[in-house]
Structures are given as C-alpha cells and as structure tokens.
Amino acid sequence: MTTTTATATADPAEQAHQFPLPKILEYPASTPPILITQGAEGRLYKTTYLLPDIPCALKYRPPKPWRHPILDQRLTKHRILSEARILAKCRRDGVRVPAVYAVDESAGWLMLEWVSGGPVRKSINERLGNRTEGIENDAELKDLMRRIGTAIGNMHKVGIVHGDLTTSNMMLEPLANPQDDNPLHGELVIIDLGLSSGSISDEDRAVDLYVLERAFGSTHPRAECVFSEVLDAYGQTFKQAKVVLKKLEDVRMRGRKRSMLG
C-alpha cells in the first residue's frame, strides 16, 4: 500500500471516523483492528480476524468522496483484485511476498499474511550507525544487497514490476534460530504491491530498478558505494536481465536530462 500522506482536507482520524471498517471486519476478532498506517489511497491495519493467534495485515481502501461513486467502486475493485492476483502469482512462482488470506473487492479490502520483522531501511540504517568509512568493505551489507538484487530479478523474471521499489517496501523476516540477532539476517520479503503490474517490458523493469536506485541514494547516501551489488546480483537472475541493465543506462540518462531542465 502506498503510504503517501493524505491531503490536508482528508485528516486521517476524520477519514477513519467517516469511513470506518466494514462491520464484518470488526467481529469476531478477539481484539479490535489496530491502525498501523494511513495513506492517501487506503489504510493498513493489524488484525486477528481469522484466528486469535494469527495476526493478519488488513488493507482497506475506503470510499473516495471526491469521486463519482460508480467510478470509485470500479477503481477500488480493479486495484484490490489486481494486487491480490499479482501476490498470488508471485507466491505460485516462488517470489517471497505476503500470502493472500481473504479478499472482498466490493467492500474494498484485502487480508494478507502479517510479516514479522522490520523494513530493510531500518536494518541498513542500524548497520551503518554513525560510520563514514569501511562501508564498501562490509561483507554482510553487500550480501544483503545481493539478496535484494536476486529478489527483484526473480520478481521481474515472472513478469511482475513493483512500481514503488524502496527499502521501506522490503521486510526482513527473522530466522527461526533465536540465537541469530543480526539485523541483516532473515528472509527478504517484498511488500506493498499496490502499484505493481504485470509486464515483461525491459523498459518497465529498468524503471523499477531506477526508482529503487534513486530512493536508495536518498535514504542511504552513505551506502551508495554498495548498491552496485544489487545490480550485479540482478544481472545473474534471468536471461533478459543484462538487457534490462543496459536499458537502465538509458533511463538514467533521461533522468539526468530532466533534472537539468528542471
């Protein structure tokens, strides 16, 4: 789910009160759903709706009062179903994303596996600490970068582009070994596929990588020296990957031109 801040006229608390969750989602849960994040397009809750001991992620797209009701309902249905289908395809083809537990496109909600752990963004920042030297030689950080590149390559290989790749949209799920408390260890899970689409276009794949590259440089400027590991690992994941990396050079060039032109 995109977590862009809602407009000034759409106060999150006001919106949640005006467009509450469908009643069915508040019962028979053992505890009320907990609002985790509020975005311009929807809300993310943690809920125990299915079973008291199994937490789930509930993505809810409330009605948009500024849209025509029929158009709004059609768009909501399309986006909910599209995300559910893409997640199911990724799971079927071996890409680690949250499992889909339930969906009601008419009511505008999608219930997913709750991924424990934290975002990759947080793990990288904790690893970096206050360091300014030796980052390019950090073997464990470079290993994480390669796992990111492999995960993205596997997703692209099955014909899915994410649309909003950032280190906030990747999670590190803790390993089963309780003795391993390294924040860089864990299974990499790609999340928030609300803007994803099916595509085998080299251009679309290159733009996906470019979005991540720009976001990474902005979020982790001191770690830019290891980002090449992402692309190196990506290039080894599927036959067309080298072509995508070549296309990425063209996308970068266009991005630089736009920056110069303002």
UniProtKB/Swiss-Prot annotation:
Keyword rRNA-binding: no
GO biological process: tRNA processing; tRNA threonylcarbamoyladenosine metabolic process
Active site: 164 (proton acceptor)
All copies of domain Protein kinase, residue ranges: 30-262
Any single Pfam family the record assigns to this protein: Pkinase
Family per record: Belongs to the protein kinase superfamily. BUD32 family.
Protein's name according to its UniProt entry: EKC/KEOPS complex subunit BUD32
